[in-house]
C-alpha cells in the first residue's frame, strides 16, 4: 500500500476574554473577539495522525481508541476546505500525488478527559486541521489555517498559536477575516502559570453550541456585553499582556469570567455551568488576594465547573501554600511538585498565613474537586515523531 502519514500535537487554550455567541452558526463566526492563553502540551495535548493513500476506501476517525463518526457537518467542512487547498496545489504542480481525491484516516488521542470543560474540542480540531495540512504540504500560514479550524470549533483557531492569542471576530460575512493572531509568544511572558481544579470530568448538561445561542436569543445582558464590555476589555487585556501587567490581566480575566457566566444566568431558561464548588473557589481566590493585599491569582471558568487559576511563577509558593492547605489531599500535586517543594508550600502557609486569616478556610471545598493539574503557558502545534497510524496499513497502531 502507498500510505502517507503526518502527525502533530496541539494544545489546549483557556480563554481569558471569553468567546460566547455566534453571528453565523454555519461558519462559526463569533459575536465578539476573544483572547486566550495557550497551555503547555507537557500536561494537556491532543496527538493526531492523519493518513491518506489511493487504497483507503472511506474517511474514518478514531478518537481515544474508539471509532467515531466523521459525518458531522463541521468536520466535513474542515476536510472539504483542506482538500480544496490541496487541489489548488495539485493544479499548480501536476506531478504531485492526487491526495485531494483520496480518503483520509485520522487517529487522535487526548491526555485529558474529552468534553469535560477542558477545551478538548479546541485542541482536537486544531490537531486535526494541522495534521491534515501537514500531510497535504499546504503552504498557508497558521493564521490562514486557523480559519479552517474555526469552522470545526470556534476556540480551536486559538490553539494554532502558542503564548497569548487573539481570535479576531472580523467583519466580513464570509468569515475571511475571522482568524487567530498571536498577541505575544511564550518567551514574551514565560512566567505565566495555571492551576486547573477539575471539579467534574463529566459531560456538560448544556453543550456550548446550544448554550451560546440560547444566550444570544434571550439575554439582555449579552447585548451590552458584546456591544461595549468586550470591545473595551479586548484592548485593555491585549495591552496588559504586552506590558506583562499581571494585576490588570488578572482583574480583567476575573471580571470577564463573571460577565460571561452572568449572561448565562440571564439566559432564559437560565444556564448553569458553575456549581457550588466553582463559586467557593471564586471566594477562595478573592480571600487569597485580599490577604496579600495584591492580586496574585486570577480565576476563570469556561462553559463548565472547572476552575483555571492563573498566577506568576514568582508567586507560586504563596498561592500553593493556600492551595495545599485546602486541596493538599487531592490528586495531582505529585505530577508537578517534589515532596520537598510541597513541604515548602506547607511551611510558607504555616509561617505567613495560619492564624492570621479573618475567616476560616473552607474545610469541605476539597471534596468537590477531583484533581489538580499544574501547568504553564506553552507553544502552539508541534511536529512529532510519534504516530498513531501504522504506515503499512493506514490503520491505528
Swiss-Prot record:
GO-annotated molecular function: ATP binding; diphosphomevalonate decarboxylase activity
Summary of subunit composition and partner proteins: Homodimer.
Enzyme class: lyase
A Pfam family per the record: MDD_C
Keyword Cell inner membrane appears in the UniProt entry: no
Chain residue ranges for the region called Disordered: 378-397
Recorded superkingdom: Eukaryota
Oxidoreductase recorded as keyword: no
Pathway connected to this protein: Isoprenoid biosynthesis; isopentenyl diphosphate biosynthesis via mevalonate pathway; isopentenyl diphosphate from (R)-mevalonate: step 3/3
Listed name of the protein: Diphosphomevalonate decarboxylase
Protein task: Diphosphomevalonate decarboxylase; part of the second module of ergosterol biosynthesis pathway that includes the middle steps of the pathway. The second module is carried out in the vacuole and involves the formation of farnesyl diphosphate, which is also an important intermediate in the biosynthesis of ubiquinone, dolichol, heme and prenylated proteins. Activity by the mevalonate kinase ERG12 first converts mevalonate into 5-phosphomevalonate. 5-phosphomevalonate is then further converted to 5-diphosphomevalonate by the phosphomevalonate kinase ERG8.
Organism: Eremothecium gossypii (strain ATCC 10895 / CBS 109.51 / FGSC 9923 / NRRL Y-1056)
UniProt EC number: 4.1.1.33
Alphabetized Gene3D superfamilies for the sequence: 3.30.230.10, GHMP kinase, C-terminal domain (3.30.70.890)
Residues reported to bind (R)-5-diphosphomevalonate: 19-22, 74, 153-158, 209
GO terms (BP aspect): isopentenyl diphosphate biosynthetic process, mevalonate pathway; sterol biosynthetic process
Gene: MVD1
GO cellular component, one term: cytosol
Catalytic activity: (R)-5-diphosphomevalonate + ATP = isopentenyl diphosphate + ADP + phosphate + CO2
Amino acid at each position: 500500500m502507498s500510505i502517507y502519514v503526518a502527525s502533530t500535537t496541539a494544545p489546549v487554550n483557556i480563554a481569558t476574554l471569553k468567546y460566547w455567541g455566534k453571528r453565523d452558526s454555519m461558519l462559526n463566526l463569533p459575536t465578539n473577539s476573544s483572547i486566550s492563553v495557550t497551555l503547555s502540551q507537557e500536561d494537556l495535548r491532543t496527538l493526531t495522525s492523519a493518513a491518506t493513500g489511493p487504497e483507503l476506501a472511506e474517511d474514518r476517525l478514531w478518537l481515544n481508541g474508539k471509532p467515531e463518526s466523521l459525518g458531522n457537518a463541521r468536520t466535513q467542512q474542515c476536510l472539504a476546505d483542506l482538500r480544496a487547498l490541496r487541489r489548488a496545489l495539485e493544479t499548480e504542480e501536476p506531478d504531485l500525488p492526487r491526495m485531494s481525491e483520496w480518503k483520509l484516516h485520522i487517529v487522535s488521542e487526548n491526555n485529558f478527559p474529552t468534553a469535560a470543560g477542558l477545551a478538548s474540542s479546541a485542541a482536537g480540531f486544531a490537531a486535526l486541521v494541522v495534521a491534515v495540512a501537514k500531510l497535504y504540504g499546504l503552504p498557508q500560514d497558521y493564521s490562514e489555517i486557523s480559519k479552517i479550524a474555526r469552522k470545526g470549533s470556534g476556540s480551536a483557531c486559538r490553539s494554532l498559536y502558542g503564548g497569548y492569542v487573539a481570535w479576531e471576530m472580523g467583519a466580513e460575512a464570509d468569515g475571511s477575516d475571522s482568524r487567530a493572531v498571536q498577541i505575544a509568544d511564550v518567551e514574551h511572558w514565560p512566567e505565566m502559570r495555571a492551576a486547573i481544579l477539575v471539579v467534574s470530568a463529566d459531560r456538560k448538561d448544556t453543550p456550548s453550541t446550544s448554550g451560546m445561542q440560547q444566550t444570544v436569543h434571550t439575554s439582555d445582558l449579552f447585548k451590552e456585553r458584546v456591544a461595549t464590555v468586550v470591545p473595551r476589555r479586548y484592548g485593555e487585556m491585549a495591552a496588559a499582556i504586552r506590558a506583562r501587567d499581571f494585576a490588570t490581566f488578572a482583574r480583567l480575566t476575573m471580571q470577564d469570567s463573571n460577565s460571561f457566566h452572568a449572561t448565562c444566568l440571564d439566559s432564559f431558561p437560565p444556564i448553569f455551568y458553575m456549581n457550588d464548588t466553582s463559586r467557593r473557589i471564586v471566594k477562595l481566590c478573592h480571600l487569597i488576594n485580599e490577604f496579600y493585599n495584591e492580586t496574585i491569582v486570577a480565576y476563570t471558568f469556561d462553559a463548565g465547573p472547572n476552575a483555571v487559576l492563573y498566577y506568576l511563577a514568582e508567586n507560586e509558593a504563596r498561592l500553593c501554600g493556600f492551595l495545599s492547605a485546602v486541596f493538599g489531599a487531592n490528586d495531582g500535586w505529585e505530577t508537578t511538585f517534589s515532596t520537598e517543594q510541597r513541604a515548602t508550600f506547607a511551611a510558607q502557609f504555616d509561617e505567613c498565613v495560619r492564624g492570621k486569616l479573618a475567616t476560616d478556610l473552607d474545610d469541605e471545598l476539597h471534596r468537590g474537586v477531583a484533581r489538580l493539574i499544574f501547568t504553564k503557558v506553552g507553544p502552539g502545534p508541534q511536529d512529532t515523531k510519534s504516530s498513531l497510524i501504522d504506515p503499512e496499513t493506514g490503520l491505528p497502531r
